[in-house]
Swiss-Prot record:
Membrane topology summary: Multi-pass membrane protein
PANTHER family: UPF0041 BRAIN PROTEIN 44-RELATED
Annotated localization: Plastid, Chloroplast thylakoid membrane
Organism the protein comes from: Spinacia oleracea (Spinach)
Protein name: Photosystem II 22 kDa protein, chloroplastic
Post-translational modification: The N-terminus is blocked.
Transit peptide segment: 1-69
Major subcellular location class: plastid
Transmembrane regions listed in the UniProt entry: 105-125, 139-159, 204-224, 239-259
Sequence repeats: 64-167, 168-273
Gene Ontology terms, MF aspect: identical protein binding; phosphoprotein binding
An individual GO BP term: photosynthesis
Record's keyword terms, sorted: Chloroplast, Membrane, Photosynthesis, Photosystem II, Plastid, Repeat, Thylakoid, Transit peptide, Transmembrane, Transmembrane helix
Length: 274
């Protein structure tokens, strides 16, 4: 009846009634599909506005600490001379290895001169005259050059680049004396290596002393005309025959020190350990 009345009303068209029906059906379908308010808050939370996002402040926390920067390596300048008296950077190309060789020659020469003076009673220059037949005054320039070279070499003025480094003494092979059948092993000494605990630095020091002794004995013989032992007699007043054991011990020591290789190795400036 209501529908018939609506149809018979002059101001209401049939199209409007159909639209109302459709709108009512759409509302029912939307209500069925639309979720509840509690679930909608969970899944469909509204995006924060620009005002709220600007007011909130986010704090970032680092899980891992930043790595500390390694300190910069400071390179030390390499010195060309280790302990030269005049600070010459190499001089004439003289190294400690060359100086060690000159020191060994000086030890052998000084020991031989003392032994020759003990046998012949004459000094180094007189023995040289006997061996060569050359008068001393003709060899004076050569002697002066030799004395000057020996003195400068003894004080390190010719340049002493490089240095000697002792070999490591740790380890089982160094600590235990290996068994053997020779005399040295029977006495409890090492079968290999140097007989004494002499290093190349010790040998260099003894060589410098031999160079100084050789040079000053030559200077003294030029002034006094007597050898090293006679000069010692003049200085101390002790007869030579009373100090013969000491002289022989000195000669033997210089010979052994000259021929016995010391431990250690020579390192130049270019081979310096990093």
């Amino acid at each position: 009846m209501a529908q018939a009345m609506l149809l018979m009303m002059p101001g209401v068209s049939t199209t409007n009634t159909i639209d109302l029906k459709r709108n009512a059906l759409l509302k029912l379908q939307i209500q069925k599909i639309k979720p509840k308010s509690s679930t909608s808050n969970l899944f469909f939370s509204p995006l924060p506005s620009s005002s709220s996002s600007s007011s909130t402040v986010f704090k970032t926390l680092a899980l891992f600490k930043s790595k500390a920067k390694a300190p910069k390596k400071v390179e030390k300048p390499k010195l060309k001379v280790e302990d030269g008296l005049f600070g010459t950077s190499g001089g004439i190309g003289f190294t400690k290895e060359n100086e060690l060789f000159v020191g060994r020659v000086a030890m052998i020469g000084f020991a031989a001169s003392l032994l020759g003076e003990g046998i012949t009673g004459k000094g180094i220059l007189s023995q040289l005259n006997l061996e060569t037949g050359i008068p001393i005054y003709e060899a004076e320039p050569l002697l002066l050059f030799f004395i000057l070279f020996t003195l400068l070499g003894a004080i390190g003025a010719l340049g002493d680049r490089g240095r000697f480094v002792d070999e490591p003494t740790t380890g089982l092979e160094k600590a235990v004396i290996p068994p053997g059948k020779d005399v040295r092993s029977a006495l409890g000494l090492k079968t290999k290596g140097p007989l004494f605990g002499f290093t190349k630095s010790n040998e260099l020091f003894v060589g410098r002393l031999a160079q100084l002794g050789f040079a000053f004995s030559l200077i003294g013989e030029i002034i006094t005309g007597k050898g090293a032992l006679a000069q010692l007699n003049i200085e101390t007043g002790v007869p030579i025959n009373e100090i013969e054991p000491l002289v022989l011990l000195n000669v033997v020591f210089f010979f052994i020190a000259a021929i016995n290789p010391g431990t250690g190795k020579f390192i130049t400036d270019d081979e310096e350990e990093d």
